[in-house]
């Protein structure tokens, strides 16, 4: 059983998939930092809110009544919140990852198209019988289906 697992785990596609997942997680962390630390503060300043991650709506007060200045304060008090600022950050994160993935796949597809050989058109090997319209070999002098004699 261990031998079978070892064969499975060391196959090329399994190893490639594992490397892809690890790189994907690392890339996701980079994009998250890009969104949280570089993009969203700038967008927040332009839109008048310095930090999108602290945009929330209190649905139910917690042990300590509000108003709360940060999401952490609301959560510490036990308030139930809708965290739409974090959701906006997540959407921006997704858009960046999706766009980066699109660019990678587009480039891979372009490389594949460059390396593909154009399809070779083969000469036809059959023709249609003029009497019964069945496909017959090009060199046939008589149709095997309707037994008509064929000219030339």
Swiss-Prot record:
Classification via Gene3D superfamilies: Large-conductance mechanosensitive channel, MscL, domain 1 (1.10.1200.120)
Gene Ontology cellular-component annotations: plasma membrane
Top-level taxon in the UniProt lineage: Bacteria
Localization annotation: Cell inner membrane
Gene Ontology molecular function, alphabetical: mechanosensitive monoatomic ion channel activity
Keywords, ordered alphabetically: Cell inner membrane, Cell membrane, Ion channel, Ion transport, Membrane, Transmembrane, Transmembrane helix, Transport
PROSITE patterns xrefs: MSCL
Transmembrane region(s): 14-34, 39-59, 85-105
Family (UniProt): Belongs to the MscL family.
NCBIfam families xrefs: mscL, PRK00567.1-4
Protein's UniProt name: Large-conductance mechanosensitive channel
């Amino acid at each position: 059983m261990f031998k079978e697992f070892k064969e499975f785990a060391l196959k090329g596609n399994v190893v490639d998939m594992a490397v892809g997942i690890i790189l994907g997680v690392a890339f996701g962390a980079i994009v998250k930092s890009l969104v949280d630390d570089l993009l969203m503060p700038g967008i927040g300043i332009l839109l008048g809110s310095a930090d999108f991650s602290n945009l929330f709506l209190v649905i139910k007060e917690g042990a300590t009544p509000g108003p709360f200045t940060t999401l952490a304060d609301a959560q510490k008090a036990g308030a139930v919140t809708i965290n739409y600022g974090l959701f906006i950050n997540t959407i921006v994160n997704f858009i960046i990852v999706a766009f980066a993935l699109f660019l990678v796949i587009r480039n891979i597809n372009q490389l594949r198209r460059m390396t593909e050989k154009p399809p070779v058109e083969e000469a036809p090997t059959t023709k249609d019988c003029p009497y019964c319209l069945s496909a017959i070999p090009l060199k046939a002098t008589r149709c095997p289906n309707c037994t008509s004699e064929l000219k030339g």
